[in-house]
Amino acid sequence: AAVIQDPAAREDENITATENAVSALGKLCEHQTQSIDAKSIFPSFLACLPLTEDAIEARAVHAQLARLLQNDTYKSYLLGENNENLARAILIFAEVMPTASSSDKVRLCDQETAMAMKNTLVQMQSTMPGDALAAAFSALDPQKQAALQACMA
């Protein structure tokens, strides 16, 4: 966690190591949940996303996020009590899902992951309190709202 939280973590000479550390943290969340303080580590992992510099790690970690959000136990750790991290998760989806007008995002998320994210959003629409989801979407700027709407079409 110290590597990820270091003030210099996002500087050019450190970004690859930082994104690899975030990837490792995600693997701990997914595969060693019982060995970590899940209520604090999962939100810390979410706060580090999206990955933007290492395309290989970005695709793997964003696919992992989609998997985690499709599992009720992991989802509860990621989103937190009262879905306090829901807006963050939706913002990440908006930033990484490819759209016709954002070809640079294609490298952050493959089509399979984009479909999993879309399915997760559809599932959230039917299972989460409407006011929580509406608040999360309204927290997005208009461009990100439009990007998500385009992905959902």
Predicted regions and their residues:
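Alpha-solenoid helical-repeat scaffold
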Residues: 1-153
